[in-house]
């Protein structure tokens, strides 16, 4: 049975892990849930990796990650290239920074030793190669020294990254923002769903990986707008080609992500329009990055628009969970038995 296509995940990232005991020990992985994955690496929850299982190197910390991957397959492709920059075909031979000087018993090139500088330099390289340069990715740094090392490399290399590539820092130590965990038994690094903030239990940071949205909540208003437009057939005409959109004809249609704008257009029209509006006219490119809506003139990002579109056409269950109205729990009624018990205790 052929698996049904899924919507673009709320979050899927490739992360860099560092031992807090020995900073030279590093690990690269991918996950849709960084807090849970960090708990696994630290042995708090089952499911870590062999290379991070040594207690002498624990605890580990996530010092940086790249988010915005459209699927687990896309993230794994990037992870493999970052782990094996000496053999990855995504890196042109003339641009390669990592080289193997030894071979394994099977004759394959042996992976060169990793260092923070080598990982960051190859990360910078991968973000600029044709395979990944136009993906809707975002780079996050959670440690000042790692971000400083990134800055030093960017300052010395000639190859520049795409100007619209977001690089975000969230060090958090100075903010001191914390939230109460649901219970003391919930392990550090596992963010509970539906925390009510009543207090009690241990505290979990709200910065760094714990501040990343793990669900579609940031898109709730956008998704609701798209559902409303198509449910009540308010598509109107394409914002680009001006052709009337027939609800019966099918096809894929993207919606402007800006609040208050209901601009809808054919997917191919949006793509051509955004590519053409780029500097140089998007010459040779297939995948748009972003631009401005032809109706409201507000900024739009292709990755965000595609996430809403895939939710609308492939993610019925996810949309229902996102838009359902949460009922407030009714106050518990006092029973006669409870009253009698309290009187006996008092």
UniProtKB/Swiss-Prot annotation:
GO molecular function: 5'-flap endonuclease activity; crossover junction DNA endonuclease activity; zinc ion binding
Keywords (A to Z) from UniProt: DNA damage, DNA recombination, DNA repair, Endonuclease, Hydrolase, Metal-binding, Nuclease, Nucleus, Zinc, Zinc-finger
Skewed-composition ranges (Basic residues): 324-336
EC number: 3.1.-.-
Primary localization: nucleus
Domain GIY-YIG: 10-92
ZnF start-end (SLX1-type): 238-296
GO cellular component: Slx1-Slx4 complex
Annotated segments matching region Disordered: 324-346
Cofactors (names): a divalent metal cation
Superkingdom as given in the UniProt entry: Eukaryota
Role of this protein: Catalytic subunit of the SLX1-SLX4 structure-specific endonuclease that resolves DNA secondary structures generated during DNA repair and recombination. Has endonuclease activity towards branched DNA substrates, introducing single-strand cuts in duplex DNA close to junctions with ss-DNA.
Protein name (Swiss-Prot/TrEMBL): Structure-specific endonuclease subunit SLX1
Gene encoding the protein: SLX1
